[in-house]
Each structure stands twice: as C-alpha cells, then as structure tokens.
Amino acid sequence: MSSLLERLHSKYSQNRPWPETIKLVRQIMEKRTGMMSGSHQHLVSCLETLQKALKVSSLSAMTDRLESIARQNGLTSHLSPNGTECYITTDMFYLEVLLDTEGQLCDVKVAHHRENPVSCPELVEQLREKNFEDFSQHLKGLVNLYKVPGDNKLETKMYLALQSLELDLTKMAAMYWQATNASVLEKILHGTVGYLTPRSGGQVMSLKYYVSPYDLFDDTTGASISLSEGHAVPRSLGMNVSVTIEATSAMYKLPIAPLIMGSHPIDNKGTPSFTSITNANSVDLPACFFLKFPQPIPVSRAFIQKIQHCTGIPLIDGSHTFLPHYELVTQFELAKEKEPGTLNHNMRFYASLPGQQHCYFVNKDAPLPDGRSLQGTLLSKIPFQHPGRVPIILSLIRHQVACNTLIGSCVKRTMLKEDCPGLLQFEVAPLSDSCFSISFQHPVNDSLVCVVMDVQDSSHVSCKLYKGLSDALICTDDFITKVVQRCMSIPVTMRAIRRKAETIQADTPALSLIAETVEDMVKKNLPPASSPGYGMASGSTALSGITTPTSSYTSGQISSLFNMGIKERHDSAGHGDDFSKVTQNPILTSLLQITSNSGGTLGSSPTPPQHTPPPASSPASNTKNHPMLMNLLKDNPAQDFSTLYGGSPLERQNSSGSPRTELGSSASGKPKKKRPRTGTEKMKNQTEDDFQRELFSMDVDSQNTIFDVGMAGDALDTPHITPAPSQCGTPPNVYQQAIPHTQANMQRMVRIPSTDAIIPDVTDILSDIAEEASKLPGPGEDCPNLGTPVRDSSSSGHSQSTLFDTDVFQVDGGGGSGGENPYPDPVDLIVDSHGSPNSDSPNTFFNSVDFNPDLLNSQSQSGFTDDLNDDSSQSGDNDFKDFAGPGLASLGIVSGLPVDGGDGKYKMALGADTVDFSIIAGGGSKNLGGPDIQETQSRSQSPLLGSDLGKDRPQKQKVKESGNGGGAGGGLSGMQSAGMEGKSMKRSRTPSSDGKSKDKPPKRKKTESDGKSPSHITNRPFTPPTSTGGSKSPGTSGRSQTPPGMATPPIPKITIQIPKGTMSVGKPSSHSQYSSSGSSSSSSSKSHHGHSSLSSSASGKIKSNKSDGSSGMKIGSSGGGMYSGQSGQSNSQSKNSSQSMGKAGSSPITKHGLSSNVNNSSGSKTKPQGKPSVLMNPSLSKPNISPSHSRPSGGSDKLSSPMKPMPGTPPSSKAKSPIGSGGQHLSGSGSNSTTKSSSGLVSSGSLTQKPNSSSSSSSSSSSSSSSSSSSSSSFSSGVSQNLHSSSKGKSPSRNKKPSLTAVIDKLKHGVGTGGPGSEDPMDGGVGGGSTGAPSHGMSSKHGLGVGEFPTKREKGEKDKSKGSSGGPSDPSKKGGGDSKGSVSTGVAKIIISKHDGGSPSIKAKVTLQKPEGGGEGLRSQMQKNYGSPLISGSTPKHERCSPSHNKSPAYTPQALDSESESGSSSIAEKSYQNSPSSDDGGGSGSRAQTEYSAEKHKKHKKEKKRLKDKDRDREKKKSYTMKPESWSKSPISADPTMAMGGGAMMSSDRASRPTPSFLMGDDDDLIDVPLTL
C-alpha cells in the first residue's frame, strides 16, 4: 500500500490545470453511462418498469415516454421547436407524433422512404389509450421491414419488393371475393389467400387461413364469435401467417412491381393472371418472401416435401432431425394451454364428455405401411418467390393443420383416474401423413372396431367404420363424416358413435341370436329346390310374374311357396315342411328374403328402382348379415326378398335399419301366416307357433344380421371389414322401384344405393333415421329391429337424435348432423337431438369440461362446417342447418329439405292435429305435389319429419284421435289399405278401382281406407316402386307390379305427379299406390277432405268420412294427397277402414289426380270408411289413435316395422316395398313415400304417428309402409282388393269379385312379384290378406303373405272375393266397414270366415275381432317383441308367426286394423296361438287363422272377442274414433298399434300399454324401445 501511494504521488506530483481534471472526470462518467448492458441490464429494466408506472398526463411526460420507447428500439427521436411534435426517425422511415399543449395525442403519421407521411389509425388508437407496449411493438415491426444487411439502396429495393407482393395478394383476395362472393368464414377456409389483413403501421400483412370449430366460440362467454364483413376479424383468431421479406444467404429474383394484370379473375375461383418475371419487373436480392407463423407448427415430412416441391426452395437442410409427428402435435397443443407447467402424459390423454369418460392413447410410433413411423418437424416460416405460390402453400398448410386439429382434439390436460368406472379406451394411430385410425371396443360385441379418418383436404374428412362381419352395425360412415366435419373433434365424434351404437343395441339386442337360429333352421330344414314345399310354384304365380328382371333368382322356392296352397306347402315332405315353417314365419321369411333383396339392391344401389341389381350382390350383403341368410337368399327368389326388404329401405340404410328392415320385410310372412290359416293345418300352425317363438327369441339378432346384410350392401362401398356406417346409412335411401317386381328387389338394392347416396347426403340419412325413429315408436319394436335405422336414429324419435344428436352437434339442434346426420341418420346421423329419449345428454353436446357446449351449435360453427367442407360452408352447415334444431333434425329436415320447408313441416306437425297431411305437405312445402312432397320429405324431411312431427303430432293427434290422427292415419291407412285399400289402391290406380271399392261397400270402406293406405304409399308416389313394392299394395301390387300398374293411366299420372319421389313412380307402384289411393281415396277421399291434411285422415272423424274424404281428397289433390290419403283413410276408416282409406287411396290418388276417381268410386264407402277413419286417424292425426296406429301397423305393422327401417331408407322407399312404405312408416303412406312421397305422407303420417310416440308413428308408418310398400298389401283387405286389382294389377278396374283364380293369381302375382307391384300385393295380400296389418307390416312379408293369400284364397272363396278384393286378408275385413282398426287382422279373419264374401264378406270381421280378442296373447307377445317385432325381426315374426305377430307391435298395428273387430279377431286368433301377442292378432291372427284349424279359430275368436271387448273399452277410453268392435281388439291393437307404429317392439309394449302411452310420441317410443331391449 505504501509503495502504491508513493507511485501515485510521484506520477501526479506535478500540478495539472483544473480544466484537465474536469475533462478527465467527464470522460470517466461518460464511459460508465455508455456501459449500461450486462450487469446493468437489471437496473435498466427496473427503470423502465418505474417509467411505465408513471402516469402520462402532461406534454413533457408524453414526450419523455416517446423518447424512451424510441431509445429502447434503437431509434432516434427529437422534438419540434414548439415541443408539440415528436419525431422518431431512422434511415428508411420516420414517425410523426402530433400532440397538443396538454400532451393529448392529435395524430400519428408514418412516412416510408421517399413517401409522404400517412396517418396510421392503429397507432393513433394505441397512443390515445396510453398503450405504449403495443406502440413499441409497432416500432419493432417497422424496423424489421428494413432489417437487411446492406446500404439504403438495397433496403429500398426490398421494401419495393414487399410492397409489390402485398399489392398482388390484396388484388388476389379481391378477385376471389368478386368471383365467389364468399363470406368471411369461406374466405378463411377456402380463399386463395385466406382472409387478408393489410399491413398497418408496424404490423405486417397477415393471412388468416384456418379456423377450427372451437376457434369460433368464446371460451369465457360460450357465445359464438361472429364473422361478418362489417366487423373486424380479430388478428389472433384461428391460424395466421405473416407476409414478410427477410434477408437470406442466397440470391433470389423477386418482383419489385405488381405482377397481376387486370382486375378480373380468369375463372370462377378468383384465379388471377400473372405477368412473367423479367428483369424489368424484378431484381436479384439477398432476400426472399416468407410466410411466417406466430408459433412454429408441426408439419410432417410428407407435407414438407410437398411444400418444397411447390416453392422450389428447401425448407430444411439435409441434417435436420425429425421427430414423431404426433409427439410434436401434442407439444404444440399443450403449449397453447394457458396452464403452466409440463404434463406427464406419456401420450395418454383424458377427455370428459357428458355421460362419457374417454382415454386416448396416441400411438406416435405406430409404423406406417413403409415400415417407418410418421415423422415431422416444427416449421416457423416458408420461403417463396412468386405471389402465385401463396394459394398452393396455404392449401397444403390448411391440410396439415386440419390433421393436427383432429389429433390435437385428443390432447387435453384433463386428468382422470385409470380405474374410473365406464372409462372408454381409444387408440389413435397414424396410417399415413393425413390418415389415422381410432380403435376401440365394439359397443355391442366383444370385438375391435376401427374408424379410419382420412383428411382428404382441409374441408373434407372421409370416415369409414370397420367392424367384423358378424358385428352389429353402429352407424353410417356418412354420419361419422358429418360429425367430424361439424366439430373437428375426435372425442365428440367418438361419443356420437357410442351413443348411436347404444341406441342400436337397445333396439336389436338379440339380432345375433336370431341370425344364428335362422341359420341353423335353414341348414336343418331347407328343402331341396325340387321339394314340394320349396319348389312347388305354379308357373303363373304372381311372384314368378313379379320376379324382378334384374333378379338372378327365378321365382324359386319362396315364390313357389307363395304359389302353393297352404296345405300343399304343409304337406311338403320333411324338409319342405320345415322350410314351410321357416317361410311361413313372417320374420324369418322376410329376413331371408330381405337378405336376398338386400344383396340385389346392393348391387344396383346407384340404379333406379326399375333396374334391380343382380342378386349377386345380395349374397354379399347376406354374408355380411349372415351366411345362413345368404345361402337362403340364393335359394329364394330375390324378388320376394326384395319386396320384404324393399319395404324397409330406411332400416337397411341405418345400421340398425338393415337388420330391422329385413325383419320388417317379413311382414309378408305374416300374410303367409294367414295363408296357413286358410288352408293350414293345426300341425302347421303349431310348427309355425314354435318357429315364431324361436324367431322371436332370435328376432333381435336376426335383425342385426339383417343389419349386417344391409351393411353388406353398404359394404360394397366400404372396406371389406364391412364398415357398418356406410352400409347402414346408404341402403334406405335407394330409389324406389317403378316396376313392381323389379321394385321388390330394387327396393332392397335401392337401399344399398341409398347408402351411397346417404354418404354424400346426411339429410337422407337423417330422414331415414327419422322415419325409422318414427317407425320404432314403441319399446315393442325391439323385435322389429328392422327399425335398425330407428336404432341408428336413436330408435324412433331418438334415432334422429342419435344420428344427429344435439349433444353431438350443437349446431342447430345438435342433432342435425342426421343425420347427415343423417343422419340427422349425421341422420344417427344428429337427428332427434331435441328431447329424444335416447339422447344421452342435453342437446348441448359439449357439456363436459373439455368441450364447449356451444361449439357445435353456433351458427358460425355451422358456417364453419359448411366452409370447412369443400362444398362450401353451406354444405356441411346447411345439412346441420337443416337440422336447425333437434326438432328439425328429428324431422329429417337436414340437408335434403330446405330448412324452411323442413321447419314448415315440423311446425305444421306441431301446429295442427288434422294438419298431419298438410304438415307433411307443408313441411315439404309441396303439399300439393305428392311426388314433390314425397321426394322432398321422404328424402330429407319425411323421415325425420315423420319422426319429429310424429312426436309433435302425436300430442296433437292425441288430442285429435289418438289412434286415428297422424301417423296412424298413414300407418293405419297403410294397414287397412293393405286389406281394403288394396282394392282402393287398385282403384286408385285405375278408375276401375272404384268398382272394387264398391264391391265391398262396408268393408270396402275399410278397404278404401286400406286403399288409402296404399294411397299413403302412393304418398310414396314419388317412389311408386315403393308403392308397387309395398305401397302399391293391394291395387298396385299385382297390377303395378306388372303391366297393370304401367297400363293403368293413373300410374302415368302418378309418375308425373310424383316425378321426384316416384323414381319412375314405379308405374305399378305409383298407380298401385294411387290406385289404392284412388279406390280408398274415393271413400277415403272424403275422409281426406275431412282431414284435409294428414290430420284430416287422422282426425277422429269417423262419422264424417265424407268430409274426411273430401278433405283428404283436397289434401291428396293438393299434394297433401299422400297425407290426405292417410287422413282420408283414417277418417273414413275410423276404426277399420280408416287406415286403409286415408292411407292409400286418398292421398296418393289425390296426389295423382286419381283422387277424384277414387273419391267418386269410394264416395259411397266414405262413410263406412269413416269408422275406419278413426283408425287411420289414430295413426295420422292422433297420437291417441296410436293403437289404431299401431293397429294399422299391426296389420301392417310388421311390415310397418320393417318398413320403418325402410323409412330409414327413403330412397329405398322409392323402391317402394313395405319398406318403401317407410314413408308410410312415418306417415303410414307408402314405402315410396318413405323416401320422398312416402316421406311426405309418412312425414305427415309420421307426424301424426309420432304423437303415437315412435311406436305409433312406427306403427302407422309401418302400416303405411307396408301399405305403401305393398300398395296391394297395404292391408290384407287391401291385398284382396289390390290383389284383385293389383294382383290382377293390369286391369285398371278392380272387380270386386274377380274369379277366385284371378284373385289368387293376383295375390300370388303380387306376392311373388316382390317387386313394386308384387310387393304391394304381397304386402297387401300377405300382410293385408292375412291381417291387412301384417301385410301392411312388411312388404316382404306381404310378398310372402300374398303367396299365402293366394293359397288361402285357393282354400276358400273368401280369398276369392275378399282375397281378390282383400277378402282373404285382413284388409278384406278392413274393407268391411265393420272391421275398423282390426280391418287387416279382422279382414283376414273375415275373409276366412267368408271367403266368398267379397268385399262385404269382410264383415266376418267380428270373428276376426274375436281372434284379436286374443289381445292378451298379443300383449304378452308385444312385451316380448317390444321394439323389434314390427320394425324388424318382430314384424317379420309377426307376419310369419301369428304369435310373433301377436306379440309384436307389428301385430298391434294389425290390432289397429284388427281393432276393427273382424280383422283383429282373425289375426288375434292366429297370433294368439303363435304368441302371447295374440291380442294384436288382428293382423297376425289372420295369418294364424290361416295356419290354425277352424277349431282353433273358434276358440281364438271367442278369446279375441273377450279381448276385443276389453280392447274396445280401452280404445274408447283412449278416444279412438273406431267402432268399439274393432277397437275391442284395437286396445291391444291400439297398444300394439302403437307398437306397430313404433315398431313391433312398440306393439308389444304398447299393446299392454294404453294407446296414450304409445301416443306419447317419438320420445316415448324411443324410451319404450330401450325398455323393450
């Protein structure tokens, strides 16, 4: 220390001047101030914090703050002499901040190099708000524009290049808007340059290129973010890129002048025309244009290569390291979470949704086909040289971001316990750079299911569901696709799939068992082709005549069986006898036949109904459904199966629909039952009883099998694993066949095509689902899993909700996406999201912590979905918009129908009791045009409308006439139509149908009602094939099937009138429907008038048949005709004929203009129909008449059930088979109606039926379906009539008393036809002939039934006069004014009792009613067959086995018919023996009677009388307008009717349950169905 001091002293010993000392001190101080970095950084930040905390309230404070900000950004600043202007400058630009004397901001101007200062609004706003941080960011952005090494000249060139790029991009954005007039959302998702925000101040130009559905919702408020041209779009919304220019090590030729020539695009996409790059307009710069991401995004190796190929500039160097792409996606998603900290996820993530807990394992290392795992990297910016590259780059980035969004939807910070009860496990694994799979356990079976999502581009996601061949269907591919595109969320989609599967499971728990049983039975009992039972078919059988041209099968075993007398078949040797049992079982027969048809349909899915695809495809679908079924199909003529299956296209379409549809087809089997009754021996009856019981136990499974088959058909388009979704969804929407015989097969085939159609059209799916939902109104429909579609749609109303569950899609009722979605299915499909009982949770799907409940419901979401879809934001959105609400979704107003029209329908359904028809018509906004209505409604609205409206309407209709109102009108109409309406149908078809109607004045009235049922079917006019296949029912069946339908002038009218729905209107079908409509319409026309809408027929205006007829006529003529027919039928037939009247004749005829003819001819019968009208009314107008409804379904419910599924297949409805009646399912109109016309009718009927709960709707629909699907078989009576006229079909006039041979031929032809015409006859003849209700129940059944009928008719003259006129079948009873609701059933009995009775013979109905008296048995059966009997297996069962029939709601629909004492009684007897559901025996009873000996008939009659008395009392209580006699059976019928309406399941449940419960509505039905299960 001392030495140091010495040195200092020696060094400074000399005295320095003071100035030098001061200078030295200053130097030291300056150095210290200039060293404020590193160690002083903390002090600097503290000073800045203090400065920010100071309030800027004076001029000096403001200038100090501005100088500080400039200094922080490396810029210089100075003040003007007066101190009110502050300049922040740099070499390339400067800012001018103008202040007043108090320090308040006046303006901020920015001046770039050599440019005049320009005011910047954003900077002004920020400084006025004292937002100095954002102001500082702007300064940084300005500095970065010129952040290039080099002199000012180079910087100027770079700025010019950036400026030219911005001008070009701005012009491109303007051109796109000019060419497309796109909305903000469309610009973002599809715009060539996205949504462009120009550069402002220091914020560079940004392009918004993608927003997910969740981006459109405000997390805090839950409200959707509005994107409109008038409002600024937040820069932070969605995914954005910034357009910049940055220095690079390489030289690039960049344009320094705009390259776009002119101001108009060269195409309709806004593509501009660029000038070529030249030295004059570009320069070489050490810089490049960049699209910069705010945060690096994960991009897979494949997309990086695509981008590099597009730009020609490498994005990454060769040494770059790639990581598992899914790992990068999870990191990216977790980084967006506001919650800090890392998540130890181990690639396992949990999602908590309403009612479900999911665990997702993201398999990041899953090998791709090339053996490598999916690799990717984080991309921060993309270089490019030309503005024309921007659209391509954005398209690729959108695609990648869409994939990332889906994968990222599984990534949540939610934590759940591993042992959480009910935790669902899912594995997400990549299959390619844009395709991945989600594997999970099958909801029903213990097997693995896989959903493959292929993100084709940012707006299209293709989904396929892969399952085992034996696995139950879950939902359609289209449904999944719509859900995904709606929400872009895997958890939401998985929940929707799960809920849909649960609905289906509830509806078809025993499908597998049924399939196995059927298979075993077939293997053991299948006789050789030459065996008498199998091959004995008269060459002239109607079946063979009806054989679809495209069908590779000749009128083989099944047709021969139809042709054979019952005794002959019974007498068949061992195997033949066993096989007889099988074939006699409506369910089994329909199932088997449906399988056949299904295959055929599959093959020709895209072809119109007339062109039935070769049966070759049938085996595939059968195989998918069940090997046994496939084999059986090979032996059986495709025609019969087509008819059976064609009757329930919707069912096929929906995953649940396929099995059920086939079961529903077995409705014809029921008629068979009736045949046995005519000439059957006790031994045979017993066998049939046993067999039915077996079938019933296996019903659900067999339905599943059917589902598989249906799926198989769909599978044609889906992977070999048989993706259930597409298979299920498509088939139902197939065209209805215009040619009767072709139609039968075609219907089935059409369904398959439907599937194809459904995939693109969620609306169709939803419609199908809606129809199915309405078809499966009651728990009793468990058996009729033909209502599989219903399952898809959450059973009945719920099916809709399931398809497009509100929970699934919050957009518009959430359910709307069927779906599609529909189902809608989108339809499973997004349908009954409103309050569908099957809905797992409220309409708001995202109630859970992880999902925004409003996400999917918001309009913007809709827009998003639409925009998200390549089609445009409207595509997806519109579909869901069509599902504007759960209600609309339920209505099936998804995409096919205009939202307004759909709403109108829905509103109408809600609004008017009697306006059922008008509702449908109104809903379709084409009330006057049956075809239009059918097409519109059936395709989109009718099914869903039927379901939804059915719900609403049930309430309204309940008020009106419970049984007669609404769907019952359609359904009942259909059923009675089967019996009496067959005649009417014929008559409708041709003027001579009037003669038929006249033949049986009292019964005729019922018949007319039945005819109206066909009319309803006619409603399906748009799908005349349905009519021929099912709707053509009595009159049309035989005729329409062949030349008759085509020859009959009314058919051409029908075709014209029903251009859309009618497909080729299936001249036979069309005319049949219309004929039927005409005949019934004559009488039912009045009732139509009374109804003046669906309601009209449904209105309990038994007494005012004339008024009903007139109103019905009006409706029919106005295009509400379909409904009108239903309505007229309901009113006219009140009890017995009500169904047939309103259903077939009135509406269709009216629609076709045949109404006047029919009206006139039926005019005298209007009054008798008046009673039946009530029956019809129940199904049409009143939920109350639900039983009636069911009844019609009962008679035709089995058909109806199967048909209901068909409604699920509105297009198939076109195919018209009983299923075609699908429309009828909903409205009781016709199969055709189901898709379009039927949809309209069904819609209306359904609407009315819906009040009956899904059950009632189903019943009505079903009956209607059956009726429409088998115009001739709209009811047994209808069959008789139809057989007379339809069977003969060719003869425009339906002679009331054709020769027995002619009648038999007609019946056979109708049955054998299995085609549009044949199907109807079959439906009518078999279903109708047997019970009218059974015939109504299922097209296929009807086909079989027809065969049986011919046999029965051969057995007795009843068949002759009644059989031909519907006498052999319940329809005949229906025809008899006496038999009311039980017409179909009663008719069958009556026919038996009075084979030669002709139409009047139907009065034997009392006896039939007695059989219906076996209602106790029916109830018990109903309980057994809850949901499925009618709609699916149950219905076929019922048709095939009296017991099943009686059990099933399908039988109950018969009960509706049988509610008219005679029909019900007859069938009740039969079905009573066969099953506990004997109460419903009206329809099944008739067949049972056929099967049973006279002794048993007597006993059953007595029992049924008792039951009838009770039932009548019950019905009276239920406010059924039908006569007490018919209602005496009707109670069971009523309940069964409900069941029928709701489906066979419903029938059982509903049978025991009062009509009111059935009338409760779709919701009720849905509830019932699960209960049944």
UniProtKB/Swiss-Prot annotation:
Assembly and interaction partners: Component of the Mediator complex.
Molecular-function annotations in GO: transcription coregulator activity
Compositional bias segments (type: Gly residues): 963-973
Main location per the UniProt record: nucleus
Feature: compositional bias, Polar residues: 651-668, 791-804, 835-864, 934-944, 1176-1193, 1278-1290, 1420-1435, 1443-1457
One term under GO cellular component: mediator complex
Lineage of source species: Eukaryota, Metazoa, Chordata, Craniata, Vertebrata
Function: Component of the Mediator complex, a coactivator involved in the regulated transcription of nearly all RNA polymerase II-dependent genes. Mediator functions as a bridge to convey information from gene-specific regulatory proteins to the basal RNA polymerase II transcription machinery. Mediator is recruited to promoters by direct interactions with regulatory proteins and serves as a scaffold for the assembly of a functional preinitiation complex with RNA polymerase II and the general transcription factors.
Residue spans of biased composition, Basic residues class: 1496-1505
UniProt xrefs under Pfam families: Med1
Biased composition (Pro residues): 606-617
Positions of region (Disordered): 595-691, 774-883, 928-1564
Protein name stated in the entry: Mediator of RNA polymerase II transcription subunit 1
Localization annotation: Nucleus
Assigned keywords, A-Z: Activator, Nucleus, Transcription, Transcription regulation
Residue stretches of biased makeup (Low complexity): 1025-1038, 1053-1085, 1092-1116, 1124-1143, 1155-1164, 1226-1277, 1461-1471
GO biological process, one term: positive regulation of transcription by RNA polymerase II
Positions of short motif LXXLL motif 2: 629-633
Motif segment (LXXLL motif 1): 588-592
